Amino acid sequence: MRHTLPHAPQFYVTAPQPCPYLHGRAERKLFTALAGDSANELNNALSRQGFRRSQNVLYRPSCESCVACMSARIRVSEFEPSRTQRRIARRNAHLRRLATSAWATEEQYELFRAYLDERHADGGMADMDIFEFAAMIEETPVRTRVIEYRAHQGDSSEIPPPPDSDQLVAVCLTDVLDDGLSLVYSFYDPALEGFSLGTHIILDHIDLARSAGLPFVYLGYWVPGSRKMDYKAKFSALEIYKGGVWQPIGDPAQHTSDIHPLSIDPIVEQVARINLPSNRR
């Protein structure tokens, strides 16, 4: 009788590229494929260790001379909205949330293009066509939802929906983990910047996680010194994954992107410390 043993994930490293967050620095990522029956379990385990999902790949920054990127998550039970965040929630309370399967639509792509053209015209995703967008949404081997936010005609709101229809104003691609919700990618109507829809998406996911009994909302990476990431530090009960452990962020100003050369471990040691699901060892 022949038995097939489970294969442990293989980890690889990308070639250095210009960092999108800190000028003059190089970015390098440690990554592994995400596939098969154990994909959800692997996604759960590695998300707790600072990894993020992009389609069928899990990755974590592993730069040669920088450890500035730190995974961030909100402790749902301890979160208290600020006065500004409460005002944002009230202003967007009329929006209808719709959770759908991971299926891309032309309407979503049009909103995505408007968002990129206005907010990230020089970014790495700026040239994505509709087929690449569909791959970003649909190529997922794990439990994923597309969360849409819509304003309806007749709503008592300042967001005017188009005649005879409702208006798609924001979208979030969300993974459902065993301990929380992970915001993979979100975008919104750039013409409605005054409504702080990015913040509203996070606040709504905190409510979603609380109602589902999930303890965390994963926000991706926080980078001290990066203005693009400043908004994440404005949420209370925020934890960062630093030095191999989750810890309260404390005063964001105390964190720096400057490091000692000996504080970065070789790739082999980093991989050896990754805790894999028990059936994948």
UniProtKB/Swiss-Prot annotation:
Transmembrane segments: none annotated. GO terms for molecular function: arginyl-tRNA--protein transferase activity; leucyl-tRNA--protein transferase activity. GO terms for cellular component: cytoplasm. One of its GO terms (biological process) is ubiquitin-dependent protein catabolic process via the N-end rule pathway. InterPro entries: Acyl_CoA_acyltransferase, Asp_Glu_LeuTrfase, N-end_Aminoacyl_Trfase, N-end_Aminoacyl_Trfase_C, N-end_Aminoacyl_Trfase_N. Pfam families: ATE_C, ATE_N. The keyword Transferase applies. It comes from the Bacteria. Its EC number is 2.3.2.29. It catalyses: N-terminal L-glutamyl-[protein] + L-leucyl-tRNA(Leu) = N-terminal L-leucyl-L-glutamyl-[protein] + tRNA(Leu) + H(+); N-terminal L-aspartyl-[protein] + L-leucyl-tRNA(Leu) = N-terminal L-leucyl-L-aspartyl-[protein] + tRNA(Leu) + H(+). Keywords: Acyltransferase, Cytoplasm, Transferase. It is found in: Cytoplasm. Belongs to the R-transferase family. Bpt subfamily. Functions in the N-end rule pathway of protein degradation where it conjugates Leu from its aminoacyl-tRNA to the N-termini of proteins containing an N-terminal aspartate or glutamate. This is Aspartate/glutamate leucyltransferase. It comes from Paracoccus denitrificans (strain Pd 1222). The gene is bpt.
